[in-house]
Amino acid sequence: MKKVIVIGVNHAGTSFIRTLLSKSKDFQVNAYDRNTNISFLGCGIALAVSGVVKNTEDLFYSTPEELKAMGANVFMAHDVVGLDLDKKQVIVKDLATGKETVDHYDQLVVASGAWPICMNVENEVTHTQLQFNHTDKYCGNIKNLISCKLYQHALTLIDSFRHDKSIKSVAIVGSGYIGLELAEAAWQCGKQVTVIDMLDKPAGNNFDEEFTNELEKAMKKAGINLMMGSAVKGFIVDADKNVVKGVETDKGRVDADLVIQSIGFRPNTQFVPKDRQFEFNRNGSIKVNEYLQALNHENVYVIGGAAAIYDAASEQYENIDLATNAVKSGLVAAMHMIGSKAVKLESIVGTNALHVFGLNLAATGLTEKRAKMNGFDVGVSIVDDNDRPEFMGTFDKVRFKLIYDKKTLRLLGAQLLSWNTNHSEIIFYIALAVQKKMLISELGLVDVYFLPHYNKPFNFVLAAVLQALGFSYYTPKNK
């Protein structure tokens, strides 16, 4: 019986263990996680804060007990602090006692995920990660300075937003998906909200300005104070350095009763030796093949937020820390360990979606800006159209954008925005087209249906393709 050690038991680790032990009884699994719970869906934190999710416990889909019942040995509140590849052993620290022990493996699975980037309290931005402690409610024990990832963070935010009457103003550092969702939740809870980011537009890493302009407009209409293009210099604290009082930026001070850091994440790979031919990506994630084996290390699998996977759009290894990628990577790694080569994760394209301030947004592949940065000869096609025939009497506006390589006509990415009816699932088949490196001419000939209840003969995707190919006879109506 082969012994497998799994480092990390959240989305990727849970998926791996469930798949492996449901398909085979030939493995002994020892799993370590430094948290006290597993499988928490952090995407639901803002929903719980705003009251959409009534019971925070519903955001869990597995437990250590379930994995133990399947045959795994699961050790919670245990941190892997060292790795010896020659001896095939890990050094594990019990966070409750501080005691360190050694465990040996035949095959290793790194599912250690990523941790929020935290900024230094007093100095300029350092991007230094604070030491993990699952019992800490706040960043660096500074009251009301918090990150957003864990169940523990969710409980703190729920208390701060919905029960703590002293919290009247909230500053959010970062305008990515987490920051924007929390901004909406804080606004729904009646807080004064300021969003601070070095980017010029909210969600500027995920969408181009035709979409971020609409998001900015909706946020300002809701009364959100946007400080875009602003660099954080540090956090303002009380005299005893126990309570945060605001944020210092290069454009002035922002007073706040609660400050949330949602800058981004950094992979937890610090325990992996840097001198043993692992190929690290620029942010510390580890490059893997289509079976999630670390390059140059066939008995080490890296899954979830610690992995850098081939991106079919950029044609580079990318670390895209999404639960969808984590779950799929865990499944593929488990199937390969069992002996199957039929299931493989050949590529990702960063497909994502956002629903805030009445807008439905979705994207896949490269933005126009990123495509240009990657050296493509970029072409774009943007249409504003109604989602179904005007003769139906009721219809909603949709904005759709294609990004492609003008030299080859290869599809590089797409973005979608709808104001009322949600059409974000259209991005699913566009994602497949980007993954398979289809040409926009091929995309235009995909056999899709027409039914006036739902769409047009020349739907907004086809309209964008026709426009890109130079067919000027079709002009979208926009009412």
From Swiss-Prot:
Entry's EC annotation: 1.6.3.4
Entry keyword Amino-acid biosynthesis: no
Protein name as annotated: NADH oxidase
UniProt keyword annotations, A-Z: FAD, Flavoprotein, NAD, Oxidation, Oxidoreductase, Redox-active center
Coiled coil: none
Function noted in UniProt: Catalyzes the four-electron reduction of molecular oxygen to water.
Residues that coordinate or bind FAD: 8-12, 33, 43, 80, 111-114, 149, 177, 295-305, 322-324, 450
Active site: H11 (proton acceptor), C43 (redox-active)
Cofactor: FAD
Family: Belongs to the class-III pyridine nucleotide-disulfide oxidoreductase family.
UniProt-listed Pfam families: Pyr_redox_2, Pyr_redox_dim
Keyword Oxidoreductase attributed: yes
Sequence positions that bind NAD(+): 170-185, 197, 264, 353
